[in-house]
Amino acid sequence: EGRPGVAATLRALNGALGRPAALWVKESGARNLRHRDFLAPRAALSAAFPGGQAPPEAVSAVPSLRGPAVLPLRVCRQTPAGLTVQVRRPEAFQRLLGPLPGPAPSAAGARTGCVVLHCPALRGPAALQPRHLRSVLLADHLAQLLRTQGVGVRLVPALTEERSWDVLRQLRICWPSGSGGSSLTDAVSALKAALGRCPCAAACEQGPGTAEGVIFKVHLKSFVEQQGLVGYDPNLDLLLVTEGTLWSLAELQEAVLQCPVSDLPALPASCFPSQSSCCSIIHVVNCEEEFQQQQLDVLWRILDPGAHTALQKHLVCGPVKVTNPSSPIGADQYFQLRKRQMYEASVIKYGELAQDEAWTEVIDTLTMAAIRFEMLSTAHRSQITLDLQNNSISTKGTKSGAFVMYNCARLATLFDNFQRAVERGTYPPLPPVSELNFSCLREEGEWLLLFNYLLPFPEVLQQAAQLPPPSSGIRITANTETVCKFLIQLSMDFSSYYNRVHVLGEPFPHLFDQMFARLQLLGAVRDMFHSALATLHLPPLSQI
């Protein structure tokens, strides 16, 4: 039998009642999970069946539901809340804790589809601001999520040596660099020639009244109206085209051409449903620069009427508001400020820190986590408010990246302590999973960790990488906050369990079964932490 999943189990439950509609829901609250794992609410049953009563033969068939990804189920009961069913928990632990949790098996196969992620914030000579950093971090995270689902990703633009990119390196943002070379120069020449033939473009001679560097004027509005394009700013009209404008388009064209032929089939339906057989272009842009990107979008459509330009979409980030800034703050200053605050908060919690390389690395990682969670745990459409006061960063808050990293480190310490105890002869080594007795896992928190986190984790990654199907508009939304929110909630539930349960107990043989089952569960939780953090380019900490 394969790895159980939430979606497959819900499909089987709905099918058992003979209704394709989603009657059943998965429970997640600790209180309800004491009595039921899945519920078909009374209101939904009343809408689907006369008198709200499902056929008795369908109800009695629920425990016999089988399938490669269907959870083993117990008796289905009629209650005041509706139909309820519980999972056969020891068997569910056995099936889920055998293989390591991670992306769905299909994601590990051959790459399918290709997405070009374009981040205009990385162009131009101006220093990065926090609002730029938000769109770059979002693109970096989305790229990693898409890769976990087997999608090829191209990142544009390449970083040039004309600017300092220290803050990107400090945040472990993986972005390509390079100058482009002669191929881009040739592409720019071809675009110039195309502009010369374009009926809505006029060449500009340098002289009085002409902005420096402008080589063409292009009337965008007539093209937008003629093509019936939807979702563009009504003020789009005259665009002054420079060499830099054409260079941007040439880079995008080259990225599309670099998508291998094997990448050109449609993206997996889980990532971009109903996609045509062409690579997709997503412009990840902050709201203040959305207008300029729309201009570039339309210009590219004019010069290159290929299928890929028609698939351009804009993922727009909301504003980043900085409270109480003494002066405008750049991304570099923001990182250094958060690093200093993280160091001071750590001193308060742990005492004066040794100035060695290990602790410097810990503070750097905590700072990365604090900034990534600050920027990514809010839906990308919403405004972020950055509080730069000293008390805004803490190692104690449950909503922060530092809290997530702290709990990840607690797991590392647990397994380090266990390994040391094994080496001392205090405990025997962890037996093979086939020899473990999962009926020992009776704590409420243990089922919570399995049912709310380990079970749906592959589907959480899939949801986070999912992009909406093509539509007539140009804006799209993505679930880029999903992984951060998942990690925060996981950390809270793990912390609550770990504070309540003594995992490494007294070295008595009659207690080993429970300890080993708990270690197997928490080993899977640790691996899940690591997999989720990897999509944020955050290395797990072994100590804090």
Which role does the model predict for each range below?
Residues 1-544:
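Non-catalytic interaction-recognition regions
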